[in-house]
Amino acid sequence: MTWIVSKLSRVIWRRKGGCFRLVERVIQGFAAQSAIRGATEGREELEARYLPYFDERLRLRQLVTYVPNKVAPIHRWFPYKEGFSYQLVEMLLREFGTDPAHHRIFDPFAGCGTTPLVARQMGFGAWGIDILPVAVFVAQVKLRGLEAYNLAHLRSEIDRLLNMPFHPSSLSAPQDVRIVQLAYEPETLEQILFFKEEIRRIDNKAIREFLLLGLTSILEDVSYTSKDGQYLRLRRDKKIPAVRDVLHSQLEMMYSDLASKQVQLSLPGLVETSSGGHSDGRCYVAQADARSFVDSFDDYADVIITSPPYLNRYDYSRIYSLELCLQFVNEFEELKRVRHSLLRSHIESRESPTDDVHHPALLEILDNLAGQDLNNPRIPVMIKGYFEDMNLVLRQLARVCRPGARVALVVANARFHGELIPVDLLLSDLAVDAGFEVECIIVTRYKGNSSQQMGRFGRVAVRESIVVWRKASAAHLS
């Protein structure tokens, strides 16, 4: 394979077979690194150095989204738009040549459990962690196999709950979380609290949490809100259906998924390892911080398939505030504690307690943004905090990975005030420092910019990629 860079036009061509193919988009365009005439040398060096590692596979564009999970049994139990598809996990496990008898799968940003659930369905032992309480709850319920339920008892409890006459509940929602009060009609909120109280009376934990997940999953549907990018938007024109009707549909769908023969066959119990194998067949998701988890777990990883929060200002404590307030927080101060515990990809990030990342390209970006009229002055704090946090994560992953382990990380680049941030390449450099080797960077799609940025700085598509690393063998580790 031959690469040619035209110094006059900065157009990049790749020779494959007997012809050249334009791959200008892959390298993000040198001139686009800064729209405010700031320094770009650090990012140009990164792009040029990693150019041979790019593998453009735009056919995967939908697999890095949650869209396919919306119709997949069990995966569809909770709407989690920030995840990737079950098909991506299947594809990567096949491409990596993994063996259930010898390899253990891990996801440090497990979200609603797509990676461990697919791994379990394919016969692997797997585990995951996440810091967002509602995500951990959803993942734990989805990971329960059929053996956790008496289907006749579950069917009976579903019917009993849905046919129970309404009565006022003794429970209340957080009074100082404004979005909860704005999101619901009083009658709707009363219905939600009624069903929550009745579900809490059920002794069987698996059934109780199954029903509670059903209720949690419909909170947006029966509200005046809509998850819209980084916000939970109010939509007063939205027609609100009856809570009982929506809950009925949700629980029937979940029950049919659990009871179907196809799903039964794809949810094995513990993995049976072949003779001489050493796989750990446990499958679980726990609440933990990816920046500091290793010492709390006696576990390991041969393959990591994950996606950290993107550097896109999304605040998961806002996006999922209704779900958090249903069962995980009782007041606004508790919601704030959740917010400030998250990886710093959002605008309310606090100043970094560490100062370990001094990458030239990152310093270049921060220097260019200094003194600019930003639409939010905390953007540089967020950018700095994001890479400080991810540096901590990568060092934790290096400790949990066995030598030769593969890591697939789905990430997206960002652009703030016309400054392009090559997240995939910056993280790859940090990963190398942590003890990994870069294998390839699979470009899956190109994302647009906000209308505000396009109006001021023009349109520049940014990469969404799967960066693939390998843990260096023991002989290469310092």
Where are these regions (language model features)?
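S-adenosyl-L-methionine
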Residues: 3-4, 8-99
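Conserved proline-anchored active-site loop of SAM-dependent methyltransferases
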Residues: 105-122, 126-133, 139, 211, ...
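Conserved phosphoryl-transfer catalytic core
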Residues: 134-198, 322-351
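SAM-dependent nucleic-acid methyltransferase catalytic core
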Residues: 189-306, 311-318
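SAM-dependent methyltransferase catalytic-core segment centered on the flexible catalytic loop
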Residues: 311-396
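Conserved beta-strand signature within the Rossmann-like core of class I S-adenosyl-L-methionine
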Residues: 334-336, 405-411
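Conserved helix-to-beta-strand junction in the class I
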Residues: 393-403, 434
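Core SAM-dependent methyltransferase catalytic element
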Residues: 402, 456-478
